[in-house]
């Protein structure tokens, strides 16, 4: 998971129940149902920008909208299946593949299509660290004790330190370290904001850091660095220990790459048809998503401000989403 982004202002996103774009709707835009459309908030910036944009659009179309904090992976088989969540806008192939398959199998959710950007999440290091570990980006360089020590901290030495995402993002980095025999200790960040604050501080000081970076996000555009090149992911890598270079353990490969998917409760289409059209047609390209996240994480704007500005600047686009059938 999983920004370009994730949230220095998650609390601000949750406060976004006061939605951007709350202008009074025209009478002709009266909704099909007054029941609230519940849009999921997760713990990174881009998804909450998207949630506020979608929520603001639907608010302008006359809908009752709630932004609902939710757990990223488990929401696929809990909130979305029960209707406690109506729609969620970012499930990444890189981390949520198993959860999406389980959600699909329930018959209670609908995959609305891809958001637009291609998803990538992997171990990443600033380019200046390559001098201390010249075999990079090949993952086998990390097995060299001298390379590991270059990434070590007092708490992990002689092991290198790998800063992973919050535990709720999963990603299987603990398993990856074990199956590939890497002399690294995985430390999970408490929040997305803390993770990227640590990155900024390390780069300012030219300190060692190896961490989970995902794209789309502003960080790989702002900072020069490289992703580690692990053995290529296949589905069997995560399910069959005999696959890959370690015949006794799974997860001996990199993370999968792929799409970012939108999901809805199966009843959205019949209860709120126009809102369903908006959600199904909703797209955002990678560059734009990175810029929006950077406005929050780097420029200090609130998610609500960023969402409202996008809604105001793109009215013809989102009205087209509302009028186009799915």
What residue ranges belong to the model's regions?
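C-terminal lobe and pocket-closing loops
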Residues: 219-282
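A bilobed periplasmic-binding-protein/Venus flytrap-type ligand-binding module shared by bacterial periplasmic
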Residues: 120-132, 258-271, 294-295
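Short, well-ordered beta-strand elements
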Residues: 31-46, 63-69, 159-163, 279
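Short helix-initiation/N-cap motifs at beta->coil->alpha
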Residues: 44-45, 63-78, 187-198
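Ligand-binding pocket segment of bilobal, Venus flytrap-like solute-binding proteins
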Residues: 85-89, 161-239
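Pocket-flanking alpha-helical
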Residues: 51, 68-107, 198, 218-223
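An extracytoplasmic/periplasmic, membrane-proximal ligand-sensing/linker region
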Residues: 34-37, 46, 169-185, 189-206, ...
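A conserved helix-loop-strand patch within extracytoplasmic ligand-binding domains
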Residues: 108-162
């Amino acid at each position: 998971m999983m920004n370009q982004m994730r949230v220095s202002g998650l609390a601000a996103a949750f406060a976004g129940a006061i939605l951007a774009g709350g202008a009074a709707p025209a009478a002709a835009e009266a909704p099909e149902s007054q029941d609230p459309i519940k849009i999921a908030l997760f713990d990174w910036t881009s998804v909450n920008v998207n949630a506020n944009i979608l929520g603001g659009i639907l608010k302008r179309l006359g809908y009752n909208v709630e932004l609902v904090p939710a757990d990223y992976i488990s929401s696929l088989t809990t909130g979305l299946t029960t209707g406690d969540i109506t729609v969620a806008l970012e499930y990444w192939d890189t981390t949520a593949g198993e959860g999406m398959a389980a959600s699909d199998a329930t018959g209670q959710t609908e995959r609305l299509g891809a958001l637009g950007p291609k998803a990538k999440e992997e171990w990443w290091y600033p380019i200046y660290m390559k001098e201390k570990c010249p075999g990079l980006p090949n993952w086998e360089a990390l097995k060299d004790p001298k390379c590991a020590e270059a990434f070590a901290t007092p708490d992990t030495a002689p092991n290198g330190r790998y800063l992973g995402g919050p535990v709720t993002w999963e990603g299987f980095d603990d398993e990856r370290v074990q199956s590939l025999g890497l002399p690294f200790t995985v430390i999970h960040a408490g929040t997305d904001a803390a993770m990227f604050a640590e990155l900024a501080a390390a780069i300012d000081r030219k300190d060692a850091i190896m961490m989970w970076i995902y794209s789309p996000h502003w960080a790989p555009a702002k900072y020069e660095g490289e992703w580690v090149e692990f053995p290529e992911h296949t589905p069997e890598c995560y399910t069959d220990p005999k696959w890959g270079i370690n015949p006794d353990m799974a997860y001996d490969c990199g993370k999968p790459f792929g799409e970012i998917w939108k999901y809805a409760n199966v009843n959205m289409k019949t209860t709120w048809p126009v809102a369903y059209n908006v959600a199904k047609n909703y797209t955002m390209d990678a560059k734009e998503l990175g810029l929006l996240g950077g406005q929050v994480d780097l420029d200090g704007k609130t998610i609500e401000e960023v969402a409202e500005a996008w809604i105001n600047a793109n009215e013809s686009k989102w009205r087209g989403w509302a009028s186009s059938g799915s």
